[in-house]
Amino acid sequence: MNKITVLCVDDSALMRQIMREIINSHSDMEVVACAPDPLVARDLIKKHNPQVLTLDVEMPRMDGIDFLEKLMRLRPMPVVMISSLTAKGSEITLRALELGAVDFITKPQLGIREGMLAYSELIAEKIRTAAQAKLSVPIITPVSSAPLSFKPLLSSEKLIAVGASTGGTEAIKNLLQPLPVTSPALLITQHMPPGFTRSFAERLNKLSQITVKEAENGERILPGHAYIAPGDRHMELCRNGADYQVLITDAPAVNRHRPSVDVLFRSVAKFAGKNAVGVLLTGMGSDGAAGLLEMKQAGAYTLAQDEASCVVFGMPRAAIQMGAVDEVMDILKMSKRMLAKISSGQAVRI
């Protein structure tokens, strides 16, 4: 079996040593070289032709973002960013994902060695995912900057539930940007650690016509708003009389994820049923597939992103194989389609 070859770029000798230790402890991957900065990395990429690059966000001589931008333009390859758990770190990381990085790993703020070693399985999984990720997907911009037209719904019973993982930050951006302020509410679960979801929501809010925010426990769900599940918390739909409400919980991980897409979709199947549209986007694994099937069985219309526009086709593929998907389509056509489906049919009180 050929091992996944990895080049680690980090200005910290300790981090380079830890990453080498972690990666080499897995039988299906190995570190072929380490670089203290992007300028050294450039030569090592030519020499070793690694399959995956791990890249520190903040470095001297040339920072990770500048290097990533040049790399994705001149020599595209799968990149996993190593980021700090700070507001600045999360902003830079989201920019890196926009530029084409496949995923990111967060450095613990205290006890670097112990913290990183505890992430060993997660790091290995992200490297495996990166090695399989599709890089031919361009940085997508909506076909038209003009928002879609959508007649306001007479009922606030209608809503859209969205789930995503690897590659999802850009897919969600492309899903939300064309939506007009008259859109129904959206509940979105994107696999992401705490500290990043607020920055992600704020970034989307600046780019969208609708209001995008990190979800808060107990808040009323309103049309024209998108609610992002907070990192490391599950988000569910619930009811309070005639209104939909957000429920945020610390329940155990589902499918090894918190937030979990299945948790969101199952609650939407229960409380919204045929008033909902379910959307499953790019991501590794199968989280969301079973929940999407429950939504379909409850009468919801279900959509999955197609393989050609996915960074990783795992989650949509699992849902398709399970018979959970009504329609498979390109991410750029999905906004219009989900609005068309949500406006067809009468709202039914569940």
From Swiss-Prot:
Its EC number is 3.1.1.61, 3.5.1.44. It holds the Pfam family CheB_methylest. GO terms for cellular component: cytoplasm. It is found in: Cytoplasm. One of its GO terms (biological process) is chemotaxis. PROSITE patterns: CHEB, RESPONSE_REGULATORY. Keywords: Chemotaxis, Cytoplasm, Hydrolase, Phosphoprotein. It catalyses: [protein]-L-glutamate 5-O-methyl ester + H2O = L-glutamyl-[protein] + methanol + H(+); L-glutaminyl-[protein] + H2O = L-glutamyl-[protein] + NH4(+). One of its GO terms (molecular function) is phosphorelay response regulator activity. The keyword Cytoplasm applies. Phosphorylated by CheA. Phosphorylation of the N-terminal regulatory domain activates the methylesterase activity. CDD domains: CheB_Rec, REC_CheB-like. Residues 153-345 form the CheB-type methylesterase domain. Residues 5-122 form the Response regulatory domain. The active site is at 165, 191, 287. The modification 4-aspartylphosphate is found at residue 56. Contains a C-terminal catalytic domain, and an N-terminal region which modulates catalytic activity. Involved in chemotaxis. Part of a chemotaxis signal transduction system that modulates chemotaxis in response to various stimuli. Catalyzes the demethylation of specific methylglutamate residues introduced into the chemoreceptors (methyl-accepting chemotaxis proteins or MCP) by CheR. Also mediates the irreversible deamidation of specific glutamine residues to glutamic acid. Belongs to the CheB family. This is Protein-glutamate methylesterase/protein-glutamine glutaminase. The lineage of its organism: Bacteria, Pseudomonadati, Pseudomonadota, Gammaproteobacteria, Enterobacterales. The gene is cheB.
